[in-house]
């Protein structure tokens, strides 16, 4: 079942933008369906859509966690995974 993932990255928009393309190159093959971001209080809010919670968890615990550690970004403490009734990217 597809899921919507929301979280706040504990980094500024400039740092996020410098890492954005590298992370998308890893996220797409891992199953990312849609990615969006916005500024919130000097940090970066994320809304992503994934094909399943398992796909999200594999990415979050692997490439995302490693990338954040290398960039010295603290893990988000507000991750919310919401199962979707329907998702259509057309």
Give the residues covered by each predicted segment.
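Short S/T/G/P-rich N-terminal loop/turn motif that feeds into the first structured element of a domain
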Residues: 1-62, 66, 72-90
């Amino acid at each position: 079942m597809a899921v919507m993932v929301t979280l706040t990255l504990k980094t500024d928009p400039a740092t996020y933008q410098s890492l954005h393309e590298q992370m998308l190159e890893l996220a797409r093959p891992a199953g990312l369906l849609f990615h969006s971001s916005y500024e919130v209080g000097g940090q970066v809010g994320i809304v992503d859509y994934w094909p399943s919670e398992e796909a999200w968890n594999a990415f979050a615990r692997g490439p995302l966690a490693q990338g954040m550690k290398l960039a010295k970004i603290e893990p988000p403490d507000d991750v919310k995974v919401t199962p979707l009734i329907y998702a259509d990217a057309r």
